[in-house]
Every structure is written in structure tokens, then in C-alpha cells.
Amino acid sequence: MKSLMQAKPFILLFLLTCSKLLSNSPQLGVPPEFKDGPEIIISDWHIGTTMWQLAVLKSIGMPVEAYSLSGHRRYALDNPSFHENPLFVNLGSWSEEKVREEFAKNNRYSRLTHVLCSFPPSYITAFEKLPPQVALLLNIGHRIHISASPNDFTQRLVEMKRNPRYTIAAMSEYDFHYMHYYTGLEPLRLPVISQHISQKLRDAPYAPCNRVVLVGPSHNTTRIIGFDNNLEYLNRLSATFAARYGLKPYTFKFIKSLYRNDQATMENLAKHPAVLINPYSAFSISMVELYHLNIPFFVPDDSLLINTMDDVRLYPIYQNREAVAHLEMQYPVSTSGYPYSPNDESTEAQRYWMQFMFFNQVKHAQRWTDPDDLFRKLYLHDLCQLHDDMQAENAELFNEQLKVWAALFGRDKKIENISEQ
């Protein structure tokens, strides 16, 4: 075989050109603007809170990486902004000395200025082990007392609010008021905007491909409020109402049963004419995503939700009665500025705190009081107009919040809308 030096001149020129191009190209799989490492890292235990905030930060031009600890990490396997590193996996258990030693070894973190954490809120304290020049942003995703000693973390949050290293925000109106009740302090409002949903889907006209109404949110597999949790009964009443008006009936199906094995993609969900929401918490990412897809959104009236939502108070899921009683004694309602505690189980307290829940904060959630009311609004109202109204509402929210995020990181002039994440 001839040696390289014996090859024809044009081959040598070709090889030299390729070598120069490769040496000047960015790292494989790393966007050119991010090749020198992130300025902000997102890391917590909830894939939903990570995905929407990652998309927002990318939209304003922030070099960002995500290190998810969630069991649902599989939802982001094809997202090159998600990374793995033992430092973030072991952050909670390693000593501060070990964390800073490992941090210093990684040149990719030399530009890091911020870490963002949302769930559970108390996990933000683990990031205090990072060098002190790294600022910490907590955007509370679900109540501050989840996975924490209620009394201890309440006081810790007050201390954080006074510490310039911290920025404390809330991604729901409920969490804003929950924190205000227990601390007397007001976090920054950074509500969920589902920027990870493509611009194409968010701008799409109302064009359902079927007559299947989704029963959600996505994690709901059994609950149908107002219909005794009986899907067959719901579909029978729907067919009867449709026949009365000579209309083709809608069929209701749970999202999880319709789309198994993680097939409930945004594209698939957007094909449906409407969604029947059965709230189990004050807000959930999957609930917000459905609204931000502009799918006509039907929710039981507040009167039907009394004693049906099991994930709005600390007891019994997150704390025992004794722990909650002690918390209420330490932070009595009389000093809170509110008429009721968010952990009060009374009917009056439940009604009061419902005003801060997601479905009562948006403009176009369709509330219904009984089956006939639901079917009248579903069959006889203009769902296309409802979709368009939701679309306008959501577009305004997204535009406003992108500006807030840009200002927070000094990126006011660099907002860019990206159509695909």
C-alpha cells in the first residue's frame, strides 16, 4: 500500500481540510453556545418541574444543563441537555469537603453561577455544599413541608429569604400563599409555563382527530368525581345526552389506559376534543400541561371537590397528625393574616384555599355542577372558540413570564422563542 506521502496532492489537501474543520468544530452533541459548560444547572427529584424550567432557560439563551434525580428520567432520554454526574447523584450524602473537591475537578462547571431546584423544596439545602459563589434559586414546586421536618424547614426558609445567596420563588399561586401563611414572607412568582411543549402545538388550531374525551390528569386512573368513579356510567349518560340532541356521542377514557407505555405524548394528547379533570392536588404539572395544550378543560365545581382531593394537606400522605398539630400550634392561624390554615380539614377551610388552586386561577376552565351541566357545556358550547380563548390566554402568560425569567438572569435582550425543544 502506498504511504500517505505518496498519495496524490488532492487527497492530501482533502485530508488536511477535514482535519482543520474537525479541530474547529464544537463538541459533539453540545450546542455551540453551551460548549464551555453551563451557567445554570437544574437538579431535583421531579421530571416535570425540570423539563419546563429547562425549556424556559434555553429560550432566553441561558447555557443550562439538567441533572435529574427523578424516577421518570426516561421521559427525557432524547434531550441532550440532560446529563449525569456522580456529584449530583451523591450531593445529599457527600460531605461539603467532598462535594467541593469533586466540583473543582470538573472544568465544565467553571462558569456556573446558579443552581435551580424545585422538588422537594427542602432539597435546595443540599446545594449549600457547592462553592459559595454559586447562587441558589428555589422555585417551590408543591408545598414547602413535603419531605421535611415542618417546623425546622419553615424557620430555615425564613433564614434563606434573608440570605442574598438565595432567591425564593413559587411556581403556583397555592404555593405562594402556603409559604406566605407559614413565614409571613412573599416569594417571587414564577408560575409554570409549559415551554417544553412545542410552539407548533401551542399555536395549532382546534382540530381534534377523534371523539374521545380524556379523563385526567395523567396520573389519575380511577377517580371520576360526580360519577361515583364509574367510567361505564359516565359514558352511558354521555351517550344518552347525545342521543337527545341527535349528536354523535363523546366517549370518555383515562389517559393512562388509552396511552400505555409512556405514549401519552403532547402530540397524542393534543388530538382530543376535551379533557375532564379530576383534581387530586392544588396543581400538578400534568394538569397544567393539558391546559397549556389549549384542550377544552372541564373541572368539577368547587362544591364537588370538598373532601375529594387527597393531596392538598400534609396529613395523611406527608406527615402524621401529631406533626401537623405541632406545626399548627407553632404557626397559629391568628397570626397568619388568613382566616384558615391550608392544613385545616374543615369544609370552610377547603373552600377558602381552593381559590388559589390552578383551575381557579386560569380564565377558561369550564366548571360544572352536575352531569347535565357538564354535558351541556361539552356538547352545546363552541369548543373551537374555547380553545382559541385558552390559546390567547396562554400566549399572553408565556410572553410575560419569559420576560420575567430574562430579567432575572440579565437576558432581557436575548429572549428567543424556540419552536422545538
List where the protein language model places each region.
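Catalytic binding pocket for nucleotide-activated donors in carbohydrate/polymer assembly enzymes
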Residues: 279-280, 284-396
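Conserved catalytic-core segment of nucleotide-activated headgroup transferases in glycan assembly
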Residues: 178-181, 185, 192-265, 286
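C-terminal alpha-helical cap of glycosyltransferases
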Residues: 376-384, 394-421
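Acidic donor-binding loop of glycosyltransferase active sites
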Residues: 270-279
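N-terminal pre-catalytic "stem/leader" segment of glycosyltransferase-like enzymes
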Residues: 19, 24-126, 403-420
